[in-house]
């Protein structure tokens, strides 16, 4: 369904640009943080189900140590490619599929001695958890305790307060609602019955219809290949965006979500009447307290938006030309404010993002239950949707040596991307956003190779940027 998650960070040394992330420095930093993150020593494996004959259940195991040589890679890319950003490199590693029964499913890729790509399977952690690990590496690089060692062995311990973590689903502030689950199921069927395909986004994607079967001997040949495109926003543009969003009582996430929907409705799907989209939300601050300081278990849910498209198309027509300096941007900002209010209302009052999360408990525990229970539901509700996730701005000034001294190392750029989903079974375009405070922000968008045209995705990003520049 989806290969992996990548968090990429650019590290810079304030003392001298010539100091790079050498093998000795990276290994020493990992040996400092290893005891904090036993997730990096986690493997999974399948065994016959304990309750259903002929089915399989996945189990986790924790290794006491691993060899970093198996997980840390040092590569060099041409200067011309590096100058364009890490998109091509990230795309290559999005097409890396791990075998978690052999070793823990993660790699740390050091690019040109300046960039770290943390590539990992979803069971290790979510996007926010990935930033915790790269931030901890930054702390380790700035730690006075750091010592260069010759060993490539990384040791773990499970003797950590609050580990293993209680399932975050059990810590959610709202109970399972069977009624809500049934209502959502009926809602999506009603959409499919009431609307023709041309009235929905992504009705023209190319879908390879596959039979989902745990024992499918061809499954290796059918693994998703990710295509990745990027929109890079410099510090000046982001500053203008943030100030404009504040003055209009909304957020950058809601503005971007609105611009995506406006662009698709006005420029690419002029006959579309209705759209369902999802905004990924980090719910850590809403969970019941846990002994562990930072939740590493997946703690991301979604807030669904159900929108009639004529108002978005109207907003798109108003902002369709850079040369038209007299357009009325009020409708764009109104839609962005409504989206922000909708997300906040859901998380603080309606809490459907929590009850939907709980619905996972309705599934069985076997691999086959996932195939027969979860995936068909995902296909029903997501196949005409896009998804947006924003990790926000990383604040490197918070990651300094614990002794209060000036930090030698800092992070100057942060990027986030999750691999494409299988077309027809989940969101067709997946937007992932991250940046650094007072620095650049990168919007990555991915999709399955062959499902959409490269020109289509490039054009979507170009028009989003055109409208963004016009309204800020």
Report each predicted region and the residues it spans:
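Non-catalytic N-terminal regions of enzymes
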Residues: 1-170, 253-254, 258-266, 399-472
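Flexible, Gly/Pro-enriched loop and linker segments at secondary-structure and domain junctions
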Residues: 2, 42-44, 98-109, 176-232, ...
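Generic detection of short hydrophobic beta-strand segments and adjacent strand-loop junctions
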Residues: 7-13, 229-233, 306-311
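Non-catalytic, low-complexity flexible loops and terminal extensions
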Residues: 14, 77-81, 124-128, 136-243, ...
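Hydrophobic "lid/gating" helix adjacent to the active-site nucleophile
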Residues: 30-48, 238-293, 348-351, 435
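Extended charged low-complexity segments that act as oligomerization/scaffolding linkers
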Residues: 157-158, 277-321
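Helical lid/core segments from catalytic subdomains that handle acyl or acyl-like groups
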Residues: 239, 302-401
């Amino acid at each position: 369904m989806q290969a992996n998650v990548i968090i990429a960070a650019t590290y810079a040394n304030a003392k001298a640009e010539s100091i790079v992330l050498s093998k000795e420095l990276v290994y020493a930093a990992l040996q400092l943080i290893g005891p904090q993150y036993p997730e990096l020593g986690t493997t999974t494996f399948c065994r016959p189900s304990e309750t259903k004959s002929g089915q399989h259940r996945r189990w986790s195991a924790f290794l006491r140590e691993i060899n970093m040589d198996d997980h840390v890679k040092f590569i060099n890319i041409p200067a011309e490619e590096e100058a364009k950003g890490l998109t091509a490199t990230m795309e290559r590693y999005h097409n890396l599929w791990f075998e978690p029964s052999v070793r823990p499913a993660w790699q740390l890729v050091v690019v040109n001695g300046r960039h770290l790509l943390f590539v990992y399977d979803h069971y290790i952690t979510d996007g926010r958890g990935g930033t915790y690990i790269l931030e901890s590496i930054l702390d380790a690089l700035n730690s006075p305790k750091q010592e260069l060692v010759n060993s490539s062995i990384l040791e773990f311990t499970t003797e950590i307060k609050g580990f293993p973590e209680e399932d975050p689903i059990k810590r959610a502030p709202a109970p399972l609602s069977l009624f809500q689950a049934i209502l959502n199921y009926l809602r999506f069927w009603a959409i499919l019955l009431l609307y023709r395909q041309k009235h929905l986004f992504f009705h023209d994607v190319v879908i390879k219809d596959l039979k989902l079967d745990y024992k499918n001997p061809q499954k290796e040949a059918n693994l998703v290949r990710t295509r990745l495109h990027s929109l890079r926003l410099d510090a000046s543009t982001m500053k203008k965006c943030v100030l404009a969003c504040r003055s209009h009582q909304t957020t950058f996430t809601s503005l971007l979500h609105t611009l995506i929907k406006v662009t698709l409705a006005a420029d690419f799907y002029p006959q579309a009447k209705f759209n369902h989209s999802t905004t990924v939300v980090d719910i850590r601050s809403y969970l019941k307290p846990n002994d562990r300081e930072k939740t590493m278990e997946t703690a991301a849910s979604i807030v669904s938006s159900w929108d009639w498209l004529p108002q978005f198309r109207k907003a798109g027509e108003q902002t369709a030309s850079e040369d038209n300096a007299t357009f009325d941007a009020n409708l764009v900002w109104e839609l962005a404010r409504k989206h922000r209010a909708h997300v906040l209302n859901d998380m603080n009052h309606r809490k459907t993002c929590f009850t939907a999360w709980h619905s996972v408990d309705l599934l069985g525990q076997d691999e086959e239950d996932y195939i027969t229970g979860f995936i068909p539901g995902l296909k029903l509700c997501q196949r005409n949707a896009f998804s947006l996730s924003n990790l926000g701005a990383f604040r490197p000034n918070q990651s300094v040596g614990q002794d209060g001294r000036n930090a030698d190392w800092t992070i100057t750029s942060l990027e986030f991307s999750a691999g494409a989903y299988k077309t027809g079974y989940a969101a067709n375009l997946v937007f992932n956003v991250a940046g650094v405070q007072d620095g650049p922000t990168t919007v990555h968008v991915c999709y399955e190779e062959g499902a959409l045209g490269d020109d289509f995705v490039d054009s979507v990003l170009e028009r989003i940027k055109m409208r963004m520049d016009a309204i800020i």
